[in-house]
């Protein structure tokens, strides 16, 4: 839990270029995690902003020409200055434009973390997926039958890119090619409001800011899953969203340790 406490103490500046659908919730989630967000996306300022930040997050959920340009500028700046960065492959299987752009970003910016659902991870790896827009396709959901196969694919993608790969879903798989974690926390309501994946990327960006990439990514995913479980008692999705942010802000280390469900593979 040292990573979490360091973020709360140091309050690192996190540069997050995300989509307008979830930008407000993402900024609030970064604040709840203990860091400070800046959501700048103008091409003429993003290099300067990234250089002054401790971590970078980019999200391709709602791309525009300017945003695509800005993310590449920031990604290259982060790589050149050894600033940790994470790319969220939102809807990467939706279009050739997104897929080609994501591949270009990964090859030129070398993000420390590549995050997506299993449909998105399969698409970036080059395997046909059954994505439904930004949602994971039914055929891509991790099951007992395809569990080992998917883990091997995630490990290969990690080794090929040099990035930690985080595949999120009913079961979350995080790997750096050598060490692999399986996380089973979470709840269905996390998939019933828009932007929870984008919010998670903001927490990942916050927790990898110290340079502890694999453990920071895993801790962020564990935290979101547990806080989802703690928030699901509410009467509806609007209340769930607010409760989720509150729990990210207030949860104790003792509760995380008590409720964590993580295994090494």
Curated annotation (Swiss-Prot):
This is Hydroxyethylthiazole kinase 2. It is an enzyme of class 2 (transferase). Keywords: ATP-binding, Kinase, Magnesium, Metal-binding, Nucleotide-binding, Thiamine biosynthesis, Transferase. One of its GO terms (biological process) is thiamine biosynthetic process. One of its GO terms (molecular function) is ATP binding. Gene3D superfamilies: 3.40.1190.20. Its EC number is 2.7.1.50. Catalyzes the phosphorylation of the hydroxyl group of 4-methyl-5-beta-hydroxyethylthiazole (THZ). Belongs to the Thz kinase family. It catalyses: 5-(2-hydroxyethyl)-4-methylthiazole + ATP = 4-methyl-5-(2-phosphooxyethyl)-thiazole + ADP + H(+). ATP binds at residues 115, 168. CDD domains: THZ_kinase. The gene is thiM2. The keyword Cell inner membrane does not apply.
């Amino acid at each position: 839990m040292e990573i979490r406490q360091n973020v709360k103490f140091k309050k690192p500046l996190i540069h997050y270029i995300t989509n307008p659908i979830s930008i407000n919730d993402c900024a609030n989630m970064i604040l709840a995690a203990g860091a400070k967000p800046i959501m700048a996306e103008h091409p003429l300022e993003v290099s300067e902003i990234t250089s002054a930040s401790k971590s970078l997050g980019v999200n391709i959920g709602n791309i525009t020409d300017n945003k695509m340009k800005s993310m590449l500028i920031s990604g290259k700046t982060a790589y050149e200055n050894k600033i940790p960065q994470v790319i969220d492959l939102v809807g990467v299987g939706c279009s050739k434009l997104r897929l080609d752009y994501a591949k270009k970003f990964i090859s030129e910016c070398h993000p420390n973390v590549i995050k997506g659902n299993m449909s998105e991870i399969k698409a970036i790896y080059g395997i046909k997926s059954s994505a439904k827009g930004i949602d994971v396709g039914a055929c891509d959901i991790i099951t007992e039958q395809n569990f080992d196969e998917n883990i091997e694919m995630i490990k290969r993608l990690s080794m090929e890119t040099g990035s930690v790969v985080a595949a999120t879903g009913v079961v979350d798989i995080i790997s750096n090619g050598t060490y692999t974690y399986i996380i089973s926390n979470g709840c269905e309501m996390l998939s019933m409001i828009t932007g929870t994946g984008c919010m998670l990327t903001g927490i990942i960006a916050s927790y990898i800011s110290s340079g502890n990439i694999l453990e920071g990514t895993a801790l962020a995913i564990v935290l979101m899953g547990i806080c989802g479980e703690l928030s699901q008692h509410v009467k509806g999705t609007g209340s769930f969203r607010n409760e989720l942010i509150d729990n990210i802000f207030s949860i104790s280390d003792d509760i995380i340790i008590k409720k964590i469900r993580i295994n090494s593979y």
